């Protein structure tokens, strides 16, 4: 498959057509990772957007966007009495915050779209998780952060559906990647591949990987609002199943990388080197065994589209070059240069 085979090529070259009817949209958030892409696309589609934030972070947003200042922890006065066609909540992972916003807005807005996560399916003990799968509503292990996150998101979903019923919509994205990433997870690969040399390739070539470009997520969320769709949707890409053995060469070609790959498929060895993940790759064992197998069938039928990996990788690399030098010098990558060098040396010594 070619580099653009996992989706539509050149998705950002044509401006989006405007919606048949512009809507009044409220975005809870709007200045993080998803928010700016969401706001830009909504405005380009002809919608009028208001964002509600704490006012602590700046973002390049289109002219005409209304900004309200407040806090999800009870300081919602700026929202009182305001009416919107829909609200998009992309800033909550605590159910008590969602309860406050849904109770305040349930008689002021038409539809409430909540940004959840495929993390609600944790532990990933069965393949092919779709939206009908039961999710945990209570944690069983206080030391398991992944479980706590998934349970919290599931409880947030419940708050939305209890307050809005058929006017509630939930999206469950997998790992979100692309320009503007606030996590420093995926940017590792574009910059590392562009640097060249011997590249540690973690895991088995056959390990499945999933991701969603933040712009594809944002466009789908706006589409759900425009189509007035209820229900829950796994927002997972690419369109078909991909493996790490396909992802790395394709990403490497996208940046014109000249390096070579040294595959380390021994999970025990990687664990000893404290290499457990490098998005979109995660170590597929134990509670993460089927982490990368969520179904996207329902979302695709509802209009979810996918831009090619080449575009995502190139745009992420270009954006990474614009972030502040202090962050680039001390990134929060899951594989650090010294760590990679030590692991490669130890792997070669083990196999000598």
What does each model-found stretch correspond to?
Residues 25, 31, 56-109, 114, ...:
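NAD(P)H-binding glycine-rich loop region in Rossmannoid oxidoreductase-like domains
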Residues 24-45:
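N-terminal Rossmann NAD(P)H-binding glycine-rich loop of SDR-like oxidoreductase domains
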Residues 48-54:
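Conserved glycine-rich Rossmann-like NAD(P)H-binding loop of the short-chain dehydrogenase/reductase
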Residues 223-290, 295-297, 314-317, 324-351:
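Mid/C-terminal beta-alpha module of Rossmann-like enzyme folds, strongest
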Residues 156-180:
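Conserved beta-loop-beta element that borders a ligand/cofactor-binding pocket
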Residues 1-14:
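N-terminal export signals
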Residues 184-189, 202-227, 231-234, 311:
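Substrate-positioning beta->alpha
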Residues 100-154, 161-162, 169:
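Conserved Rossmann-fold NAD(P)-dependent oxidoreductase catalytic core, especially the SDR/UDP-sugar
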């Amino acid at each position: 498959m070619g580099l653009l085979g996992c989706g539509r090529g050149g998705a950002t070259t044509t401006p989006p057509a405007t919606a048949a009817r512009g809507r009044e949209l409220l975005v809870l958030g709007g200045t993080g990772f998803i928010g700016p892409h969401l706001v830009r696309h909504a405005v380009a589609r002809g919608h009028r957007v208001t964002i509600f934030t704490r006012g602590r972070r700046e973002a390049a947003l289109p002219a005409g966007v209304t900004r309200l200042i407040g806090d999800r922890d009870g300081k919602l006065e700026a929202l009182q009495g305001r009416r919107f066609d829909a609200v998009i909540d992309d800033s909550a992972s605590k159910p008590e915050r969602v309860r406050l916003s849904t109770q305040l807005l349930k008689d002021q807005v038409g539809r409430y779209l909540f940004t959840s996560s495929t993390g609600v399916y944790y532990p990933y003990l069965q393949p092919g998780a779709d939206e009908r799968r039961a999710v945990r509503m209570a944690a069983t292990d206080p030391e398991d952060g992944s479980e706590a996150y998934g349970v919290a998101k599931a409880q947030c979903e419940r708050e939305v559906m209890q307050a809005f019923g058929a006017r509630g919509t939930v999206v469950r994205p997998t790992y979100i990647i692309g320009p503007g990433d606030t996590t420093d997870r995926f940017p590792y690969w574009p910059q590392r591949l562009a640097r060249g040399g011997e590249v540690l390739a973690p895991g088995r070539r056959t390990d499945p990987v999933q991701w969603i470009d933040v712009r594809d997520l944002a466009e789908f969320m706006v589409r759900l609002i425009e189509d007035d769709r209820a229900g829950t949707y796994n927002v997972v890409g690419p369109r078909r199943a991909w493996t790490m053995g396909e992802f790395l060469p394709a990403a490497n070609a996208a940046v014109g990388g000249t390096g070579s790959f040294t595959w380390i498929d021994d999970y025990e060895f990687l664990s000893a080197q404290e290499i457990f993940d490098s998005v979109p790759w995660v170590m597929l064992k134990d509670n993460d065994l089927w982490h990368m197998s969520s179904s996207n069938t329902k979302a695709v039928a509802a209009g979810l589209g996918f831009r090619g990996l080449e575009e995502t990788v190139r745009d992420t690399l270009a954006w990474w070059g614009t972030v502040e030098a202090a962050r680039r010098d001390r990134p929060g990558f899951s594989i650090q240069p010294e760590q990679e060098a030590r692991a490669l040396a130890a792997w070669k010594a083990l196999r000598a």
